[in-house]
């Protein structure tokens, strides 16, 4: 795309609006290098990245990025094996750490997928191992003492020497106060010295390192610390040598990763730029327009990004595929130029992958180039008039524009005789129309109104003017040609009516009719626009509501999945625990060579007890699901409110069912009846269990005539058989006799854990000679 259009439309000024949101040098450089694209897939990917980031932020909060500087020169020197400073190592560390933080943020993000951003993230190289090597620096770029064992020893020695020197110097300071010009210990040539009065220089033996400007003070290093200072300086030399060695070793370890570090820096910069686009999008209520290749430009609530938000006027601009040319007529200062610039600028921004100031649903066609003749480009050096300057530019545009270009003309044909100017304007527009070039032109020539009405694929437009307030509203009116309001404005400003009447007589009847027609058309257009705005407001509210509902729905689904997963895990734990206990029970059973029937029953009860009892009767979800499976035409139901059976006839629109109960037909809600399963359904759910029955168990046992031991064994076996046969009540006839057998029966029943209760039989059924027992 030509550079001139970027200058005319002030493209770089709009780019500057993104700069404050960028925190990395690489992100700022990507913004500076940004140019409009023509590849739809590349632009769409840029939009998709912003959409991904918006979704990510909504679900997980805003990604925080730290400030980083440009590593280009640092990495170049690293590759040349030149020495780096501690601060430069810290700059490398910042970039590496930031890459790790970004990767961690995306890895830990929940409830969102970012396929477009994943393309960039997949290229990030894991350099976490290098961070550990760079942790030897503090934020200022100084090495920590533990950067190496040698450095630790050297610095410990330095501190020891400094402490010893400080102690001696403090003693000498106190002892020689009268000989000093100041009561301080100072530094000269990296050595601690005392400020001695010149006349007292012989009182303190030592080395003179400096003299004050007046010559009144000598800075003397006492002989008592010369040796210690020499040792201290030697240790400092060793410290510098060790630091240099550490730097060199670290640089050699980083050099093989210089390409990865550089790539990560640019990838981080790209993420930073995507983040800045999102922040611009959110702060300005901007949109990511739909990209088209069918020459359709549809902008809803379009705003010029360089006009302050408080005063900017939004416009709906529909320059669809069926139109070639829009001719905006009417007086100056109405906003025609801003409208042209808005269309061109928003198109360029969209083709740069940037959000545009418009409402959702906007569409932008991708142009190969955009040309404009806007503003006064008169050249004094070339001695060109205003008209000549414009015409030179127009000649260039006509030579370069093709069917995939957008052309913008401001005041086409101005600067010359009105009739000739209008004729030229029509001829230029017709040339572009015949070549199928998308064109928008503003003009104040009335002749172009007729051209807009009479010519196919050309439409008139105008900027609305409020007569009552005598000022433009800056609203674009498509389909309505502009009209002059000179007479009405003059009347309101106080021009005598006689003059206005004479002026009005100079205007032909046809022109009066046209102006009246335009006035009515403007009124109708305003009504349509107002109605359209109300509809769009409702649409936006519906979209917002739909968005909120979708978010709530997704949240409910996520919570449901979480609860299901949680329940599944709990169920697995229950099953696992029950399985282990069952295995233990079975093991105990296997350990016994033979089991009595009552022991088998006890084991079975124990196994049954492992299964958790769950009450689903109050589970509304299951009840609803069950009801939905059974609710169909012809299904048999039990009508709970009537206590009768019925049949479902049909489902009504209000959600109720028509139910036939004999000769009665009524409408019922689903909670007023229950589905009755058919015999086939019951049979399908029933599992056949074969039982081997050796003999039919009677409900009565007669122990009369048996010995004690025989009766006791017989009673045990009988109770076991009764339990296996699922008997509820048994009768044990023991007779009265001596009472020994009766007492044995009573004790057995009392201790048996499967006996719920027992009592003597009624008088007519044996009285105290028989005992009736109820089984659990």
Curated annotation (Swiss-Prot):
InterPro entries listed in its UniProt record: DNA_mismatch_repair_MutS_C, DNA_mismatch_repair_MutS_core, DNA_mismatch_repair_MutS_sf, MSSS, MutS, MutS2, P-loop_NTPase, Smr_dom
Protein keywords: ATP-binding, DNA-binding, Endonuclease, Hydrolase, Nuclease, Nucleotide-binding, RNA-binding, rRNA-binding
Domain Smr residue range list: 701-776
A Pfam family annotated for this UniProt entry: MutS_V
GO molecular function per UniProt: ATP binding; ATP hydrolysis activity; ATP-dependent DNA damage sensor activity; endonuclease activity; mismatched DNA binding; ribosomal large subunit binding; rRNA binding
Binding site for ATP: 330-337
Superkingdom in the source lineage: Bacteria
One BP term from GO: rescue of stalled ribosome
Enzyme nomenclature, EC number: 3.1.-.-, 3.6.4.-
Listed HAMAP family: MutS2
Subunit structure: Homodimer. Binds to stalled ribosomes, contacting rRNA.
Summary of the function given for this chain in its UniProt record: Endonuclease that is involved in the suppression of homologous recombination and thus may have a key role in the control of bacterial genetic diversity.
Family: Belongs to the DNA mismatch repair MutS family. MutS2 subfamily.
Protein name stated in the entry: Endonuclease MutS2
Lineage of source species: Bacteria, Bacillati, Bacillota, Bacilli, Lactobacillales
């Amino acid at each position: 795309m030509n550079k001139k259009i970027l200058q005319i439309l002030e493209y770089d000024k709009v780019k500057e609006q993104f700069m404050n949101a960028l925190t990395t040098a690489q992100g700022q450089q990507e913004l500076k290098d940004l140019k409009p694209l023509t590849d739809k897939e590349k632009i769409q990917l840029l939009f998709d990245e912003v959409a991904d980031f918006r979704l990510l932020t909504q679900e997980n909060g805003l990604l925080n990025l730290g400030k980083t500087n440009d590593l280009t020169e640092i990495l170049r020197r690293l590759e040349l094996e030149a020495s780096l400073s501690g601060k430069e190592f810290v700059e490398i560390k910042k970039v590496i750490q930031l890459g790790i933080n970004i990767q961690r943020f995306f890895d830990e993000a929940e409830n969102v997928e970012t396929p477009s951003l994943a393309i960039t993230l997949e290229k990030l190289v894991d350099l976490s191992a290098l961070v550990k090597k760079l942790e030897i620096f503090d934020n200022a770029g100084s090495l920590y003492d533990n950067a190496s064992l040698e450095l630790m020893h050297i610095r410990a020695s330095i501190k020891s020497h400094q402490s010893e020197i400080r102690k001696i110097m403090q003693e000498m300071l106190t002892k020689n106060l009268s000989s000093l010009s100041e009561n301080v210990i100072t530094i000269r040539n990296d050595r601690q010295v005392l400020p001695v009065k010149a006349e007292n220089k012989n009182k303190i033996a030592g080395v003179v390192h400096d003299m004050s400007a007046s010559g009144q003070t000598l800075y003397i290093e006492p002989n008592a610390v010369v040796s210690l200072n020499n040792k201290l300086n030697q240790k400092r030399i060793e410290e510098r040598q060790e630091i240099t060695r550490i730097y060199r070793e670290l640089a050699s370890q980083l050099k093989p990763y210089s390409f990865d570090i550089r790539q990560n820096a640019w990838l981080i910069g790209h993420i930073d730029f995507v983040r800045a686009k999102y922040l611009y999008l959110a702060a300005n209520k901007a949109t990511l327009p739909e990209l088209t290749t069918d020459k359709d430009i549809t902008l809803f609530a379009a705003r010029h990004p360089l006009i302050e938000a408080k005063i900017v006027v939004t416009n709906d601009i529909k320059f669809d595929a069926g139109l070639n040319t829009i001719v905006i007529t009417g007086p100056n200062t109405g906003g025609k130029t801003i409208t042209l610039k808005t269309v061109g600028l928003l198109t360029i921004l969209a083709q740069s992958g940037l959000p545009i100031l418009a409402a959702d649903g906007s569409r932008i066609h991708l142009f190969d180039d955009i040309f404009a003749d806007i503003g006064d480009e008169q050249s004094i050096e070339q001695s060109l008039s205003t008209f000549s300057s414009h015409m030179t530019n127009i000649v260039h545009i006509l030579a370069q524009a093709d069917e995939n270009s957008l052309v913008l003309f401001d005041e086409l044909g101005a600067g010359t005789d009105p009739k000739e100017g209008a004729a030229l304007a029509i001829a230029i527009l017709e040339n572009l129309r015949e070549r199928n070039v998308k064109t928008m032109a503003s003009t104040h020539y009335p002749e172009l109104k007729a051209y807009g009405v009479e010519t196919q694929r050309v439409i008139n437009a105008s900027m609305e003017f409020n007569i009552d307030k005598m000022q433009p509203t800056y609203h674009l009116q498509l389909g309505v040609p502009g009209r002059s309001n000179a007479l009405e404005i003059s009347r309101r400003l106080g021009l005598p009516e006689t003059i206005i009447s004479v002026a009005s007589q100079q205007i032909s009847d046809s022109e009066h009719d046209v102006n009246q027609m335009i006035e009515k058309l403007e009124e109708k257009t305003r009504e349509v626009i107002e109605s359209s705005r109300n509809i769009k407001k409702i649409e936006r509210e519906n979209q917002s509501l739909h968005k909120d509902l979708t978010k709530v729905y997704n949240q409910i689904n996520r919570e449901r999945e979480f609860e299901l997963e949680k329940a599944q895990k709990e169920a697995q734990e229950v099953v696992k625990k029950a399985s282990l206990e069952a295995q233990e029970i079975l093991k105990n059973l296997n350990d016994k060579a033979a089991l009595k029937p009552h022991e088998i029953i006890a084991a079975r009860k124990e196994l049954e007890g492992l299964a958790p009892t769950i009450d689903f009767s109050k589970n509304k979800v299951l009840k609803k699901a069950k009801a939905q499976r059974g609710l169909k035409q012809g299904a048999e139901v039990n009508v709970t409110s009537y206590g009768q059976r019925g049949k479902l006839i049909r489902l009504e629109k209000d959600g109720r069912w028509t139910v036939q109960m004999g000769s009665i037909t009524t409408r019922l809600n689903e909670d007023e009846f229950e589905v009755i399963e058919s015999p086939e359904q019951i049979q399908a759910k029933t599992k056949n269990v074969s039982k081997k029955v050796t003999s039919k168990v009677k409900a009565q046992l007669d122990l009369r005539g048996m010995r004690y031991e025989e009766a006791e064994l017989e009673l045990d076996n009988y109770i076991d058989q009764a339990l296996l046969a699922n008997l509820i009540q048994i009768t044990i006839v023991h007779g009265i006799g001596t009472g020994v057998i009766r007492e044995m029966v009573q004790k057995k029943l009392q201790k048996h854990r499967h006996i719920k209760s027992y009592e003597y039989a009624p008088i007519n059924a044996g009285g105290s000679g028989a005992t009736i027992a109820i089984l659990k």
